[in-house]
Amino acid sequence: MFKRARSIACLCIAATLSPPTLANTNSLELPDIGTAAGGTLTIDQELIYGDAYMRIIRSSQPIVNDPVLNQYIDTLGHRLVASANDVKTPFQFFMIRDRNINAFAFFGGYVALHSGLFLHAQSESELASVLAHEIAHVTQRHLARSMEDQARRSPATIAALAASVLLAIAAPEAGIAALTATTAGNMQSQINYTRSNEKEADRFGINTLAKAGFDVNAMPRFFGRLADEYRYASTPPPMLL
């Protein structure tokens, strides 16, 4: 979503989880959703995965419990959802207390913002632009589509791919390594597929912004400002990579 050379670099990255937390995914009773030859991941299965991952986040991340902030984020998010296309799941918006600039969405309509990103936005439209992009990732089912695309390219089960994709959201470097092992040589096609998703999320996100009455120029302005600010940083925000 952010770097313009990479289709406005990804905002679909998540809060950094510690290795012990990631290990907890092994104990989750995730549904058996078939092999590469199986059917499409259903909405109900996405909801199960989303709830499971949210349990991990609740137990490991400092979620903001301020009722005023939570109400504001929820109201803003649902204003955008009301103007979005292809809404198939309920949405839940929340904030993680983390000064790092980050935002992410995952199965089941969960959308999170880091407090650092919230504080960095200079207008409501800029904040809304981030939420609109993440909402588009959910409505267009980018995680499920990415999993299914990879399942067609390898003998791994979709369930194994789910773990890799969720790991990629939580810890990009580890997730990329997992995806590399899982897809065995199909990484370039995965990168291209991700870029395609980002372009689609930009397009749907800007459309949602316009329909909801926000400034559509806020998205390129905010993302561009962040890219310029962290251009020479040794450790830029994950969402700018």
Describe the function of each predicted region.
Residues 24-170, 187-193, 200-240:
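Peri-catalytic and regulatory segments of divalent metal-dependent proteins
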Residues 14-15, 26:
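Residue-level detector of alpha-helical hydrophobic segments embedded in or interacting with membranes
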Residues 1-9:
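Bacterial N-terminal signal peptides that target proteins for export
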Residues 11-13, 113:
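Conserved RecA-like P-loop NTPase ATPase core
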